[in-house]
Amino acid sequence: MHPQRSANPIDAIAPDKIRPRNMLPNRGRHFLRQTLLATLLGVASAAPLMAAPLQLPALVEPASQEHHVGKVIFVELVTPDLAAAKHFYGGLFGWTFRDISAGGTEYAEASLDGRPVAGLIHKNVPPGEHRQPSWLSFIAVRDVDAAKKIALQQGAKVLFEPHSIPDRGREAVFADPQGAVFAVLASSSGDPPDVLAAPGEWIWSSLMTSDPDTAAAFYQTLFDYEVFDFPADKPARHLILASDDYARASANALPANRPNAHSHWINYVRVEDAVKMAAKVVSLGGRVLVEPHVDRHGGKVAVVADPMGAPFGLLEWPDTESKEVNK
C-alpha cells in the first residue's frame, strides 16, 4: 500500500481463474495484475476514535500526482497508549517513529527505511466505554465531498466530516451500510505507486462483512471497482475488489462461528515468516487471534492483536509470484 524503492508490480492469476459477478455490473473487462491476497477469518473492531485534524507530512515525497482511486493508500492506528504501541510495532516490524503534536493531540508517524508506513493517534477511551483500538484504512478518492454524497446516497453514515489537512490532503471517515468503518483520502501529493510491499509494509486489506454481495455493491458504486468471484470455478466465498487492473481488497463473509461479530476492515502486513512473527507478537505482549495457516492463494496468514487489542494481519508472501497475464 506504500511506495517501495526496488520492487516491481506483481501480476495476478490467469484470466481463466476469475470472472466478474453477473449481479454486479462492471464497466470494463480488465484482468488483474496484483497478486490476489485474502483471508477467510477476521475479528471484530469497534468504530475508531477520531482525533482532530493535524498538520501532517505529504503522503508522497516528492509529489507524483499519481492517483489510484480505490487503493488503500494509508492506515492509522487509534490507540489509548501511544508509547506502548510504538514499543510494540517498533519491536515487531522495525518501524521508527517521529512524534507530531498539535492542538493537544499526540500523533506519531511510523516509517520503515525512511518510507512512511502508518500513523498512530493517541486517544483516551472514556471510563465505562469498551471501544476496541483499531486500524483505520484510508482509500484513495479524487473528490472527498463527492464521495460523501455518494456514500450517503448508498446508505453509509458520516463519522468524521470532510476536512483538509495541510500538505496531506482532504479526508473523511464513513461507516458503510453494514457498519464497517473506513476513511477516504484525496492526497494532495498523489498516491503511492502500485508495487509489491516489502516485509514490514502493508500488503493487503480485507473487508469482513455480514453481506459480501451488498457490501461489494456499495464499494463498487463508491470507488468504481470491478468485482470478481475468486476462484471462479467454486461457489463464491469471497469477492475481489479491483481498480486500474489491480486487486485492491477483498470482501469476505464473517465466520459462521462468530455470530456476534461486526463488519470491519482488517489490514495485513507482509512478513517473511508468519509463524515466527506470530510468536514475536506474543513475546511483545500481543495475542494471536487466528493461528498461522495457508490460505487459498498459497500465502500463509495469521490474525493478531497488539497489547491494546487492535487487530491486524500477518501475511507471508513470496517474491516469486510474477505470472504474466495476457489480456
PLM segments and residue spans:
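N-terminal secretory signal peptides that target proteins for export/translocation
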Residues: 1-31
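Bacterial N-terminal signal peptides
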Residues: 34-48
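Vicinal oxygen chelate
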Residues: 49-67, 70-80, 108-110, 126-150, 152-203, 207, 228-244, ...
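Core segments of cupin and vicinal oxygen chelate
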Residues: 69, 76-115, 153, 159-169, ...
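Short loop/beta submotifs within extracellular cysteine-rich repeat domains
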Residues: 85, 95-97, 116-118, 128, ...
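Active-site-adjacent scaffolding segments
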Residues: 101-117, 121-189, 195
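Non-catalytic, C-terminal membrane-associated alpha-helical segments of glycosyltransferases
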Residues: 249-250, 264
